């Protein structure tokens, strides 16, 4: 784990790690979830820098009944703590039937941005917004029925929606890991000089993408509708 950093002017407490010069990527590993039991537990993530040092630990807080009935459609809070055990980021996802979103707060109680899903028939699309709901970035994903074919890239683009300035990558899991759990790994890449708040919001986008598209357990409600 990395040692605590000095508070930086204009950077929310706890986001100093994201404001470091040279930090251009984050890596997420999810703990084993729903292993063998078939029931979804609260997700937990290790968040590391590019040299493998853990800088944050994220833990979901959601209702067990709601989690196992509605699965990836559930609402939740994600509490993110630094290595001192201080909660520095909170993410709030309401339960919605469509066009999902997540609010990112740093410190908890102070909104720094939103991730909002856009309407699209076949391709995942999201907008990254500031606290005033002004769109700053776009995220564009691939045709997801092909998601078993290797690493899956979600491109982070500017307002013109042309050139990529970053990327969220779902890295392919090993066969054994996929058999026993929902364990996944992600890499988030962004410009070195990106604002620390926007890096935190992209982290929220990654967590939302993981739960929306790559979580397999739960969702008993949909199974009942389909007659299992």
Residue positions per predicted region:
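Aromatic (Trp/Tyr) and acidic
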Residues: 90
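Low-complexity or membrane-interfacial segments used for flexible interactions
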Residues: 1-77, 83-86, 94, 99-101, ...
């Amino acid at each position: 784990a990395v040692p605590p950093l000095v508070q930086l002017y204009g950077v929310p407490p706890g986001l100093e790690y994201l404001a470091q010069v040279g930090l251009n990527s984050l890596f997420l590993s999810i703990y084993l979830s729903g292993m063998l039991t078939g029931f979804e537990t609260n997700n937990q993530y290790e968040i590391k820098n590019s040299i493998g040092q853990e800088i944050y630990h994220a833990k979901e807080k959601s209702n067990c009944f709601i989690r196992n009935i509605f699965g990836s459609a559930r609402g939740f809070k994600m509490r993110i703590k630094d290595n001192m055990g201080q909660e520095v980021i909170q993410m709030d996802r309401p339960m919605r039937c469509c066009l999902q979103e997540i609010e990112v707060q740093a410190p908890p109680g102070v909104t720094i941005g939103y991730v909002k899903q856009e309407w699209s028939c076949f391709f995942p699309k999201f907008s990254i917004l500031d606290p005033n709901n002004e769109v700053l970035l776009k995220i564009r994903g691939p045709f997801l029925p092909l998601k078993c074919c290797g690493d899956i890239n979600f491109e982070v683009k500017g307002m013109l929606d042309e050139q990529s300035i970053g990327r969220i990558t779902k890295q392919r899991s090993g066969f054994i890991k996929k058999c026993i759990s929902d364990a996944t790994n992600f890499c988030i890449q962004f410009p070195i000089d990106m604002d620390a708040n926007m890096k935190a919001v992209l982290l929220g986008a990654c967590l939302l993408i993981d739960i929306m598209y790559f979580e397999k357990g739960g969702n008993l409600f949909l199974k009942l509708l389909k007659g299992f």
